[in-house]
Amino acid sequence: LMSKRTLEREAFGKKFSDFSNIRQEVAISKCEIEQARLLTLSAADKMDKLGNKEAKDIIAMIKIVAPDMALKVIDRAIQILGGKGVGPDTHLAHYFAIARMLRLADGPDEVHMYQLGKSVIRSYGKL
């Protein structure tokens, strides 16, 4: 939706897709989506092979990374779409609210970061 809109929307006589900062926002979004996707696949693989208990650190990483990524990408899409981004035609405002809620659904990010940090430090010696 965001990338398609860059080909349609114009400012100062140029398509959005011609602006380097817009291309950068699209590129960053693509990278963040792929990072979260690969982390999720890695976690699923670890869960399948070793079980959920052994995968708890990577599961915590996903619970931190995925909702945060979704918020950032949706926010960029809203920004690029302008007023249309918060209108009823795109549902982006609704998705933004859902993504924000997901950051709290299984405990706030800080809880996951605390536990993950503790686990990582413990793996290097007694805490």
Task: Report residues per predicted region.
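Alpha-helical interface subdomain recognition
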Residues: 1-127
